[in-house]
């Protein structure tokens, strides 16, 4: 279960890296779409956790994910409007969306502590992968200084999410 999701979410890094290796650099509109999509997917997963979990720590973590990712995505939308740029859908965004939908369906079959552990384990894997992709691919590939700055700010927030998820995961063992 976790392996399937971890492999799927690695699409951020792998597909982005493949594009770069082939000399096809990601454009700022593609980067903006990937980043926004990743945030929306984490919000959807967090809302699922809020509705299904009874664990106060898991629910608090999920509420933070909704709040923080909503705020970062609002900043992203404000920036693309200011720059008059339309985020461009791409293979990475589509792969992430499909895999996240599959994972939410898988999680919907779990209950109680089993759900909590699986959700938090996914959050650890998700943020580890997203943070790696931000550091190694998305931030270096961004050409607009304001987009690059927003991605760097997001990375700091998401590194905190990763640490928080790791703490909750340890407490659930």
Where are these regions (language model features)?
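His/Met- and acidic-residue-enriched segments that coordinate or traffic transition-metal cofactors
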Residues: 2-7, 12-173
